[in-house]
Amino acid sequence: MAILERLAEMQNATGKNRVVMVLDGMGVAVMKKLLDTDGFFYRHLTDTETAIIPATTVAATTAYRTGKMPWETGFIGWSQYFSETDEVIEIFLNRNLYTGELSKMLQHTNTLPSKTIVETMNDKGLRAFEVMPAFAPGGFDTFDAWLDRIVELCNTETDAYIYAYWPEPDSAMHDNGINNPIPKNLLREMEQKIENAIGQIHNKTEFLITADHGHKEIEHLFIEDYPDIAKCLMHPLSLESRCVSLFIKPEYVQKFPELFNKHFGKWFKLVTKTEFETTYLHAEQPIRFIGDFVALATDKYDLKQRSDTIILKSHHAGITPDELEIPIIKINRLIDCNFII
């Protein structure tokens, strides 16, 4: 929750532009592996925070944009089980995770459950903007165009809040792993371009650069290889492959923890629905998308229903430090000094 408090401070400040820049997946461990410690980001790294749990884009960026925790918005993980249509639906895509077909469940997915902070500020007559990738209305196809828009806003506004999100280096790490030249070169290029862009700003502007979560290279386990576990499941796996929601048939609920831990206890922490909701989500009410148990990854494995689903080389949403520790990078561009401090 501390990260939301930091964002609230940025939103409530006055007398300068405030930019919250979210680089997807750029956790502290990723920075350590891919960036030079004397580079721009490290020079301005002032602190670290714990990511919102689950440490995943659906939960974190929705919280960043609305100021509400995942239990309040219902946006908890990449895929969630909906009893209305008996589907596990990819929240941002409104697509059945296991068939690839579009879902009929339109009331929850694709639409934020409440106004964004930017919308609320605009309703109050305050200056606020979102700068997003192409998947959002008015979003940008390239990183350069995205950065240009941020610079443009900072040079035309003097007291505005700007939320800016970019989906890298997350995608590059999913596809290639962390310890690979592709995400390394990409993140270093992004760092250099951000430094250059901030140098073009002439108005007093404060930047907070952070991430939604970190990343960890992974290997895979499949429920289809464990028939004694598969027979216990009432619905297919949902939420995240490293934060797995498990709906269990009533007759297996009592013995499921022992059975699960026999196979996966070395790599996952199994908690009850109530424990996950209260201890990890800090929820004030039960959440219908959470099954009887949740399996939290503590090692290098993820847990998937079948081997024919999308396989990622690096992932997140577990509870390892690599996934949970995110940076707080603070940069002040001051008009009266004309340099970055």
Each model region followed by its residue ranges:
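Feature captures the catalytic ectodomains and active-site-proximal regions of enzymes
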Residues: 1-341
